[in-house]
A protein has these predicted regions:
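Short, charge-rich binding segments
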Residues: 64-66, 91-95, 102
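Typically the conserved alpha-helix immediately C-terminal to a functionally engaged Cys/Sec
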Residues: 52-65
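Short acidic (Asp/Glu) patches
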Residues: 81-98
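Short acidic DE-rich linear segments
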Residues: 144-147
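Thiol-based oxidoreductase modules, predominantly thioredoxin-like and allied folds used
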Residues: 23, 44, 67-86
Length: 147
């Protein structure tokens, strides 16, 4: 059962204040992720401690980097159940995990960060991994290689 909205609102805002679009319905997820064009980050938010202490701060750090995905999205596990399930269907080859981060390029998951890759790590270390993935898959050089 989802937590009361007033409890999770600050956790949602910790992500959306960095330009990440929240997807709360199946229709929103399909409209955003479904076309599969360009690069998109999908952050699966969570109420857990490793989201608060690692994943959300790491996301903020990584998004301050010059190179980042064209589209930034988030769903909230345990809150927006249908939207989260639909988002996870786009990266079904990966075990459901929250928090987690999927980096999608042209409809294909090219990088995935599971919860176990977040737990016990500093936000800086997690962000460094995300930035490396951004450089590899989202840079102008990466785009030129796809053409």
């Amino acid at each position: 059962m989802p937590y009361h909205e007033t409890m999770v609102k600050p956790m949602r805002e910790e992500v959306t204040r960095h330009g990440v679009t929240e997807l709360r319905t199946v229709a929103e997820v399909d409209a955003a992720i479904g076309p599969g064009e360009g690069t998109a980050l999908v952050f699966v938010n969570s109420i857990c401690g490793c989201a608060a202490g690692g994943a959300r701060p790491a996301l903020a750090l990584a998004l301050s980097h010059g190179v980042k995905p064209q589209h930034l999205y988030t769903v909230f596990a345990g809150q927006d159940l249908d939207a989260t399930a639909r988002a996870r269907s786009y990266f079904a080859d990966y075990q459901p995990s929250s928090p987690s981060v999927a980096l999608v390029r042209d409809g294909e998951v090219v990088h995935f960060v599971h919860r176990h890759m977040i737990e016990g790590r500093s936000p800086q270390a997690i962000a460094a991994d995300l930035v490396a993935a951004f450089e590899k898959y989202c840079s102008p050089q990466a785009a030129a290689k796809r053409e």
